[in-house]
C-alpha cells in the first residue's frame, strides 16, 4: 500500500510520561509505555533511522532497560509490528464480512482502519516501513502481514466488480492497486491533519465515495 508519511506536529511523550522513574511501575505498564513511544518513533523515522535513545528518553528510562525488555532494536520493532498488524487484519476482516450492502464495504473497511489507528496513526508506517531491508527477518515478518491485507483487498475488489457483472481478473488486479494506494494515501493525509478524528475521516470518506460513485 502507499506508505507516504504526512507531516505532523511533535507528539507528546508516550502516555504523557516524561522522565518517569522505573520504580513502582508494573512491568506490563512499562512495556505499554515503551511500545507506545517506539510505535511513534518507528512510524515517523522507519526502523533504520529510529533512535533507541529517543524512545528511552520519551519514556524516561535508560537504553539498557529497552534491551532488557525487548532484547534488541529488532525485537522492539517486531513487538510493535505484532501489536498493530493483527488488529488491522481483524478489523478489516470484520468490516468485509459484516452483513450489509456490498457497496458500503469500502467505507466500512476505511472506517475500521481509522478506528484501529485512532490513537497511533504512525502504526500504519510501522507495518509499511520502507526502510526494512529485503531478506531480513523484519522484512519477512512485515511482508507476511502485508500479504494478508493485500489478499483481503484483492478479494474485496474482485467481489465488488463481480457485483457489477465484471469478472475480468486484470480489472480486479488494477482496482486492487488503486484501492490499496488510496488507503495508504488517506492515512498519510490523516497523519498530516492531526486535528481530524477517526470519525471525521470516516465521514469525509463517505462523502468522497458518494461523489466518486456519482
Q: For the regions a protein language model found, what residue spans apply to each?
A:
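N-terminal intrinsically disordered/low-complexity leader segments
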Residues: 1-29, 161, 167
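Short secondary-structure transition hinges
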Residues: 75, 108, 115-154, 165-169, ...
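Amphipathic, non-transmembrane alpha-helical scaffold segments
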Residues: 27, 35, 77, 81, ...
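Short alpha-helical scaffolding segments that buttress acidic/His motifs in well-ordered protein cores
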Residues: 113, 127-128, 179, 209
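Hydrophobic alpha-helical connector segments
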Residues: 79, 93-122, 167-168, 175-179, ...
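Hydrophobic alpha-helical segments that form the core
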Residues: 2-10, 167-189, 200-212
